[in-house]
Amino acid sequence: MNNFSHWNEAGRPKMVDISEKEITTRTAIARSTITLSNEVYQAIQQGGIKKGDPTQVAQIAGIMGAKKTADIIPMCHPIMLQGTDLQFDYEKIDNGYALHIQATVKCNGKTGVEMEALTAVSIAALTFYDMCKAVDKTMVIKETYLVEKTGGKSGTFTHK
C-alpha cells in the first residue's frame, strides 16, 4: 500500500493533503466511446428520439458530472472548475456507428482535473445510452481513458 497516496500509516483511507502544493493551471482531456446501431443513428438524425437530442442532454449531464465529481469519487477534492466542454463525433463503423465523446476540463488549482474529465465523459456516455435505449439496448460503452493532462508537479501526460 506504500505506493498509493490515499492510505495513511495505519493502512486506512485518507484524503491527500494538498495544502502545501502550488496553484497551477491544470487541464485534462478524457475520451469515451459508445457504439450504436444504424437504427439508433438514423433515429437521432431524424429527430426520432422521444426524450430529445441525446447529445445535447449528454453534454449538460457531462458538465454536471464534472462539477459533482468530488461528491461521487470518495477521495477527490472539491475543485473550482474554470471550464468544461464536451465534443461528440460520430464515426461510421462496420456494424453501425461509434460516438466518440471527449471532455476538456480546466482549472487553476492545487490538484488535477483528470477525474473530473473522466467523470464527464462517463456520465455523458451513460446519459446518451439512457436517452437512446428505447430504440436499441445493444449499445456498448467502450473504452474510457485519459487522453492528456497538463500542469502540476508531474507535468504533462499524453496517452499513447
UniProtKB/Swiss-Prot annotation:
UniProt keywords, alphabetically: Lyase, Molybdenum cofactor biosynthesis
Keyword hit for Lyase: yes
Catalytic activity: (8S)-3',8-cyclo-7,8-dihydroguanosine 5'-triphosphate = cyclic pyranopterin phosphate + diphosphate
Keyword Lyase: yes
Active site (UniProt): D130
Signal peptide (residue range): none
A Gene Ontology molecular function term of the record: cyclic pyranopterin monophosphate synthase activity
Annotated pathway: Cofactor biosynthesis; molybdopterin biosynthesis
Pfam families noted in UniProt: MoaC (PF01967)
Top-level class of the enzyme under EC nomenclature: lyase
Annotated substrate binding sites: M75, C76, H77, M115, E116
A GO biological process held by the record: Mo-molybdopterin cofactor biosynthetic process
Domain of life: Bacteria
The EC number(s) this enzyme carries: 4.6.1.17
Family note: Belongs to the MoaC family.
Subunit structure: Homohexamer; trimer of dimers.
Function: Catalyzes the conversion of (8S)-3',8-cyclo-7,8-dihydroguanosine 5'-triphosphate to cyclic pyranopterin monophosphate (cPMP).
Name of the protein in its database record: Cyclic pyranopterin monophosphate synthase
Gene field: moaC
